[in-house]
Amino acid sequence: MRMIRAIKQGQWAVLLWPYLLTASIPLDCRDEQGVLSHCPSISQEKLLDRVIQHAELIYRVSEESCSLFEEMFIPFPLQLQRNQAGYPCITKALPIPSSKSEIQQISDKWLLHSVLMLVQSWIEPLVYLQTTLNRYDGVPDMLLNKTKWVSEKLMSLEQGVVVLIKKMLDEEMMTTTYSEQGLFQDDGQPEMLEYVMRDYTLLSCFKKDAHKMEILLKLLKCRQNDMHSCR
């Protein structure tokens, strides 16, 4: 019954799926040597719009993926305990502002670098998630396709943010050095429930961070238009 309900809730997403696969314009912009450039052929404003579009779609699909996973694999009592499962979000230690007042006070430069840190911190965990989902019995193709799509689009978003940093700040790419050892270490043969709760935490945390990426980028866009009206 839970599987049927989850599939019904996801039917509208199936209709939207071809659009999601084609609507987002690629953010890659490389020179003849294959190195990311300043993208002289596209304006800073249009590039920022494309980056925001990618972030919006990534958040939307991550929300759908988390809901689908929850419906299919998480009993309701455990849904209430997901924050007590002993798996903190992997980006918890990153120096990224969380409150509205903190976000309002940071510079455009730090807004961009905060987005880049979040994006880079999630690339490997999402690849890891795709491998762990194969352990599940009856995992729907819809969930596998969504996680794969998000993983690929996140790498595209990274490229777009890097080019945006080059354009707006005239800076080179920075790489986030963050260890996911606490999340990915193999504790022998964990129970299936432990796998499920760990992956559920991963999806929930990514959904939250994907929303934060979108918020930060939209604040940056607002500042470009009218600094005093941004809240």
Swiss-Prot record:
Chain positions carrying an annotated carbohydrate: N145
Top-level lineage group: Eukaryota
KW Nucleus (keyword) present: no
Principal subcellular localisation of the protein: secreted
Keyword Glycoprotein assigned: yes
Family annotation (Gene3D superfamilies): 1.20.1250.10
Signal peptide location: 1-24
PROSITE patterns in alphabetical order: SOMATOTROPIN_1, SOMATOTROPIN_2
Keywords noted in UniProt: Disulfide bond, Glycoprotein, Hormone, Secreted, Signal
GO molecular function: growth hormone activity; growth hormone receptor binding
Compartment(s) where it occurs, according to its Swiss-Prot or TrEMBL record: Secreted
GO cellular component terms attached to this protein's record: extracellular space
Tissue specificity: Pituitary gland.
Disulfide bonds: C29-C39, C89-C205, C222-C230
Pfam families associated with the record: Hormone_1
GO biological process: animal organ development; growth hormone receptor signaling pathway; positive regulation of growth; positive regulation of receptor signaling pathway via JAK-STAT; response to nutrient levels
PANTHER family the UniProt entry points to: SOMATOLACTIN ALPHA ISOFORM X1-RELATED, SOMATOTROPIN,PROLACTIN
Family: Belongs to the somatotropin/prolactin family.
Protein name: Somatolactin-1
Organism: Sparus aurata (Gilthead sea bream)
